[in-house]
Curated annotation (Swiss-Prot):
Upper lineage: Eukaryota, Metazoa, Chordata, Craniata, Vertebrata
GO molecular function term, any single one: odorant binding
Designated name of the protein: Olfactory receptor 5W2
Signal sequence coordinates: none
Glycosylation sites: N5
Topology of this chain in the membrane: Multi-pass membrane protein
Originating organism: Homo sapiens
Keyword Membrane attached: yes
Predominant place of localization: membrane
Chain ranges on the Extracellular side, renumbered to this chain: 1-25, 76-99, 161-196, 259-271
Similarity-based family: Belongs to the G-protein coupled receptor 1 family.
């Protein structure tokens, strides 16, 4: 690429979800409601865990950070997408685009790894409940959490640096509602083979590590549960895992479909619909899954409700 003839763009133009004027108002109302529920539910989960002493355990410590990740990466994309549905000017500054991608990637990657850490936490709780608080001390929890965020930051910086040093000298229209890597690579006039290789390798490593961690943890959990003689004991042990497994299945399933399907079947329109699901819908579902299926969270909500009313 001749870099001297490659002019630097000052901004990008996000084409958004649809160009149909009749659908825009309806989609705005629907996604605004989804985002408000998402924001309120995740913020509420964080506040509830901080306020209720009974929820000051490793499991809920990690759950509060799962809600924090959901809140951050959905907020990185949601408000801009909502504004663009009604605004005439859908531009985003070049560095604003880079920042949006950076924040989104940090917290999406962190959530991916955090789900694996939460599986490890469930393994420690079930395999040896008497030593659970010792094995999962505050120091261990913070070390695991620090590792999660450091990997998320490192991965995001690698992809951002490689993507935003490419040459964008043609169209500045991104066929998406936020600055994601695949549509940016399609827009670039540079050779993107290195970017694609790094994206596949690094993201593949994170996905493989996460899925392997969850799989190994639950193999040990199942073996441990099988040693419990009473049906009630088995049910109690597994009941704490169902919410986590639901969250893993929804999040990982969406990501695998998004980034690991054959290039021959790749469609930007399909990509946008899938992105909408995991940037807005999945973050909304996580706190609902954990609150509706978790006895401790239900009890904490009842106590908070009684405090407010009385």
């Amino acid at each position: 690429m001749d870099w001297e003839n490659c002019s630097s763009l000052t901004d990008f133009f996000l084409l958004g979800i649809t160009n149909n004027p009749e659908m825009k108002v309806t989609l705005f109302a629907v996604f605004l409601a989804v985002y408000i529920i998402n924001f309120s539910a995740n913020l509420g989960m964080i506040v509830l865990i901080r306020m209720d002493y009974q929820l000051h355990t490793p499991m809920y410590f990690f759950l509060s950070h799962l809600s924090f990740c959901d809140l951050c990466y959905s907020t990185a994309t949601g408000p801009k997408m909502l504004v663009d549905l009604l605004a005439k000017n859908k531009s985003i500054p070049f560095y604003g685009c880079a920042l949006q991608f950076l924040v989104f990637c940090i917290f999406a990657d962190s959530e991916c790894l955090l789900l694996s850490v939460m599986a490890f936490d469930r393994y420690k709780a079930i395999i040896n409940p008497l030593l659970y608080t010792v094995n999962m001390s505050s120091r261990v929890c913070y070390l695991l959490l620090t590792g999660v965020y450091l990997v998320g930051i490192a991965d995001a910086l690698i992809h951002m640096t490689l993507a935003f040093r490419l040459c964008f000298c043609g169209s500045n229209e991104i066929n998406h509602f936020f600055c994601d890597i695949p549509p940016l690579l399609l827009l670039s006039r540079s050779d993107t083979q290195v970017n694609e290789l790094v994206l596949f390798t690094v993201f593949g490593f994170i996905e493989l590590s996460t899925i392997s961690g969850v799989f190994i943890s639950y193999c040990y959990i199942i073996l441990s549960v099988l040693e419990i003689h009473s049906a009630e004991g088995r049910f109690k042990a597994l009941s704490t895992c169902t919410s986590h497994l639901s969250a893993v299945a929804i999040f990982q399933g969406t990501l695998l479909f998004m980034y690991f399907r054959p290039s021959s079947s790749y469609s930007l329109d399909q990509d946008k619909m899938t992105s909408l699901f995991y940037t807005l819908v999945v973050p909304m579902l996580n706190p609902l899954i954990y609150s509706l299926r978790n006895k401790d969270v239900k009890e904490a909500l009842k106590k908070l409700k009684n405090k407010i009313l009385f």
